[in-house]
Swiss-Prot record:
GO BP field: transmembrane transport
Pfam families referenced in this protein's UniProt entry, alphabetically: Mito_carr
Predominant subcellular localization, coarse grouping: mitochondrion
InterPro entries: Mit_carrier (IPR002067), Mitochondrial_sb/sol_carrier (IPR018108), Mt_carrier_dom_sf (IPR023395)
Protein name: Solute carrier family 25 member 43
Organism placement in taxonomy: Eukaryota, Metazoa, Chordata, Craniata, Vertebrata
Length: 341
């Protein structure tokens, strides 16, 4: 749901760069909330106060301020390949779901987005697992020194398949995620009492946040089990910090419910929901600012600080067409005649 309408005035590389920079900044500024979410999902520390603020304060005092950003570098690094794979997969699925007349239903479009997200997650899954391991370790006594060292260590100690531990939950969790997306989308016109094509920018932002809250809440139990499976390792102190012992995904569900009740599957949801508005707010504003810079560079607007269009420029032209048109008129510009005596 967190997508922007394609602007033909940007090149493919510029769109990817804008999305990458926006994602990197939003991830970095909300990293402490992501840390609190993962810590609550993997293991509830007995005898300590719960909640995102208490968790962040405890990590800060024990490991220092820098520890609040554990795993964020890996999360940012995986953003670019993940976005590229997701975009390529989405285009393939759109072609697959498009009918003979070139139309695609809204349900098919949502399914294409969900499947593309699932493909990109599977392809880049080892980096997500490593991010979880880095978050769970104590940076004062680290088991892994970084992305490459973690990849090498896990591969040597636990085998290649350990890098994909819990990946099945990504596939299963896509079902409630897609259902939540469709549920929100089908009720948008009822919520705003108006057609979708007339929604304002604040309304679209609210739609994205609402969809994220619903879909993440529905799929959160699968995310919790996935995080526990990612973190669990006999080679790490305290089995990776996992608070229940299990032998597989189904057994993990069973042990969580047995030890903590059904609501234990939603441990960390508060921090996750608190992250939604600032995350998408930073992402949208950063993307729009980067987009303005690119539009100014391409010659469509007069300044990156405003959306004032350049007079005489056809906004329907693509960047390559606009460059060729400028080059054409530049070569056709008459040379000044020399004065004759």
């Amino acid at each position: 749901m967190a997508t922007w309408r394609r602007d033909g005035r940007l090149t493919g590389g510029q769109r990817l760069l804008c999305a990458g920079l926006a994602g990197t900044l939003s991830l970095s500024l909300t990293a402490p909330l992501e840390l609190a979410t993962v810590l609550a999902q993997v293991g509830v520390v007995r005898g300590h106060a719960r909640g995102p603020w208490a968790t962040g304060h405890r990590v800060w005092r024990a490991e220092g301020l820098r520890a609040l950003w554990k795993g964020n570098a890996v999360a940012c690094l995986r953003l670019f390949p993940c976005s590229a794979v997701q975009l390529a997969a989405y285009r393939k699925f759109v072609v697959l779901f498009t009918d003979d007349l070139g139309h695609i239903s809204q349900w098919s479009s949502i399914m294409a987005g969900s499947l593309a997200g699932m493909v990109s997650t599977i392809v880049t899954y080892p980096t997500d697992l490593i991010k979880t391991r880095l978050i769970m370790q104590n940076i004062l006594e680290p088991s892994y020194r970084g992305l490459l060292h973690a990849f090498s260590t896990i591969y040597q100690q636990e085998g290649f398949l350990a890098l994909y531990r819990g990946v099945s939950l990504t596939v299963v969790g896509a079902l409630p995620f897609s259902a939540g997306s469709l549920l929100v989308y089908m009720n948008l016109e009822k919520i705003w009492n108006g057609p979708r094509d007339q929604f304002s920018l604040p309304q679209n932002f609210a739609n994205v946040c609402l969809a994220a809250a619903v879909t993440q809440t529905l799929s959160f139990p699968f995310e919790t089990v996935k995080r526990k499976m990612q973190a669990q390792s006999p080679y790490l102190p305290h089995s990776g910090g996992v608070d229940v012992h299990f032998s597989g995904a189904v057994d993990c569900f069973r042990q969580i419910v047995k030890a903590q009740g059904v609501l234990g599957l939603w441990n960390g949801l508060t921090a996750n929901l608190l992250k939604i508005v600032p995350y998408f707010g930073i992402m949208f504003s950063t993307f729009e600012f980067c987009k303005r810079i690119c539009l100014y560079q391409n010659g469509y607007i007069l300044s990156p600080l405003s959306y004032k269009l350049t007079p005489g420029v056809d906004q329907s032209l693509q960047p390559q067409e606009l460059r060729e048109l400028k080059k054409f008129f530049k070569t056709r510009k008459p040379k000044p005649k020399k004065p004759t005596l």
